[in-house]
Design a protein with these regions (language model features):
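Helix-to-loop junction immediately C-terminal to a conserved catalytic motif
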Residues: 16
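Conserved ABC ATPase signature
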Residues: 97-101
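A short, proline-enriched helix->beta-strand linker immediately N-terminal to the Walker B motif
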Residues: 116-120
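ABC transporter nucleotide-binding domain
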Residues: 138-227
Length: 262
């Protein structure tokens, strides 16, 4: 998880062996992935951020084409393509041209092609960027299902992507790891840093904004409730310590505009 420009795509390309690290190593079962070479790539599935497919191909024909590139025999490729098209919810439109697909449907074709070789590791670079809320929810549910049997490495700047599917999160900024852990571990680290403050008017909002970072503003009939974060304890009379959310963590480390895509 990280804002645009944090280095997520670079990292995904390195894990997929498409880009060599300038220093350090990436290990799989204790061995450098670049020395494992084809033995490593044979167990990896990859969906790049800018995935596209031949638009005149049908979804099934495209998967059969990718299967041929992977060296699969026709019968195996056909059986696998049908199975995956059912998994991603595209079996009923398998013979439809990809040019007629929505962005979310194309991403699901991308997931299917990445799963053709039964990968042990599935690498997904910003897979939900640009999708509408319904397609994004469908995509997250699909990832939860796939993740039962496959290691899924997902990069995103969208908080809701990882809140519902990730077992562990690495937050990066400017190519550096800021923190790493389970959701509970990361949220526990934010305890005592998130507060609710109720004010009466806009001038009080501005006063709070000058002192603390505001995560959200909820305007009610009689008052305005501010959700704020602070590294130090807030002793204002109207401040109430509340349980942290992942949005608070993101706001604590990154800018507001990166956290508002939901």
């Amino acid at each position: 998880l990280g804002p645009n420009g944090a280095g997520k795509t670079t990292l995904m390309k390195q894990v997929a062996t498409l880009k060599q690290p300038t220093s350090g190593k990436i290990l799989y079962n204790g061995k450098d992935i670049n020395t494992l070479d084809e033995n490593y790539r044979a167990i990896v599935g990859y969906l790049p951020q800018d995935f596209d497919a031949y638009k005149n191909f049908s979804a099934k024909d495209f998967l059969l084409y990718i299967g041929a590139l992977k060296g699969m025999d026709k019968r195996t490729a056909k059986e696998k393509a049908d199975k995956l098209l059912k998994l991603v919810g595209l079996y009923d439109v398998r013979n439809k041209a990809i040019s007629k697909f929505s962005g979310g449907m194309k991403r699901r074709v991308g997931i299917a092609q990445a799963l053709l070789n039964d990968p042990k590791i599935l690498i997904l670079d910003e897979p939900t960027a640009g999708l509408d809320p319904q397609e994004r929810a469908r995509f997250r549910n699909l990832l939860s299902q796939i993740g039962k049997e496959t290691i899924v490495i997902l990069s995103t700047h969208i908080i809701s992507d990882i809140e519902s599917v990730a077992k562990e999160t690495i937050m990066i900024k400017d190519g550096k790891v800021l923190l790493q852990g389970t959701h509970k571990e990361i949220l526990d680290d934010m305890n005592g840093k998130v507060y609710s403050i109720k004010v009466k008017n806009e001038s009080e909002v501005y006063a709070i904004q000058n002192k603390y970072k505001i995560v959200s503003i909820q305007r009610g009939v009689e008052d305005i409730e501010l959700r704020v974060i602070s590294e130090n304890s807030i002793t204002d009379a109207d401040a109430k310590s509340i349980d942290p959310r992942f949005e608070d963590v993101y706001m604590f480390y990154f800018d507001l505009e990166d956290s508002r895509e939901v």
